[in-house]
Swiss-Prot record:
Documented activity regulation: Allosterically activated by GTP.
Gene expressing this chain: upp
Keywords: Allosteric enzyme, Glycosyltransferase, GTP-binding, Magnesium, Nucleotide-binding, Transferase
Family to which the UniProt record says this protein belongs: Belongs to the UPRTase family.
Residues binding uracil: I193, G198, D199, A200
Protein name: Uracil phosphoribosyltransferase
CDD domains: PRTases_typeI
Record-listed E.C. numbers: 2.4.2.9
SUPFAM superfamilies: PRTase-like
Function statement: Catalyzes the conversion of uracil and 5-phospho-alpha-D-ribose 1-diphosphate (PRPP) to UMP and diphosphate.
Annotated cofactor note: Binds 1 Mg(2+) ion per subunit. The magnesium is bound as Mg-PRPP.
Disulfide pattern: none
Annotated GO MF terms: GTP binding; magnesium ion binding; uracil phosphoribosyltransferase activity
């Protein structure tokens, strides 16, 4: 399973700002969108193109457009919403397929409680977005759901990933490609990524934050 850690200078700079313990909700939210957009650039670099002719100012001109499968963006609720606008800024025509996954804080197991998928998801490339890939439970549950719905080409974009989460996805779904801004050190005893970002959902929505 390919894992792409995107070490672009802009991503490294923005991710460094996001790691600050005293970052404001506004700044964290804006940076999540910006890094999400930059990851989208990488995750769509291999989209197929086809040529066609248009009337140009000096006569007919041959240009290119994206061909083949279209895209559906799949935010894992709730934190994935924080990356959605950044992704849609590059692929504004994409459909949004929302998946709600809750994690049991004691067992760390994931439970799916919502699915609103594009009706033609089998004909689209699915881009899952979630700020954190920690234990991998939420990601694996989401991929399970998408494949059951007929999705055949699935990619995941996360801001930070733990090795444990990457391995969980690799074991369950070796065909899924992961794009991340950083592969961090490890998980702590509570299942939080170290050094991580803290609780990304709380920081995006301005609710109570937890230490990570």
């Amino acid at each position: 399973m390919p894992v792409h850690e995107i070490r672009h200078p802009l991503i490294r700079h923005k991710l460094g700002l996001m790691r600050r313990a005293d970052i404001s909700t506004k700044n964290f939210r804006e940076l999540a969108q910006e890094v999400g957009a930059l990851l989208t650039y990488e995750a769509t670099k291999d989209l197929p193109l086809e040529q066609y002719e248009i009337p140009g100012w000096a006569g007919p001109v041959t240009v290119e457009k994206i061909s083949g499968k279209k895209i559906t963006v799949v935010p894992i609720l709730r934190a994935g919403i924080g990356m959605l606008d950044g992704v849609l800024s590059l692929v504004p025509g994409a459909k949004v397929s929302a998946v709600g996954v809750a994690r049991n804080e004691e067992t760390l197991e994931a439970r799916t409680y919502l699915e609103k998928l594009a009706p033609d998801i089998a004909e689209r490339r699915s881009l899952i977005i979630d700020p954190m890939l920690a234990t991998g439970g939420s990601m694996v549950a989401t991929i399970d759901l998408l494949k059951k719905a007929g999705s055949k080409e699935i990619r995941a974009m996360v801001l930070v990933a733990a090795p444990e989460g990457i391995e969980a996805v690799r074991q369950a779904h070796p065909d899924v490609i992961i794009y991340t801004a950083s592969i961090d050190e490890k998980l702590d005893e509570n299942g939080y990524i170290i050094p991580g970002l803290g609780d990304a959902g709380d920081k995006i929505f301005g609710t109570k934050q937890k230490e990570a």
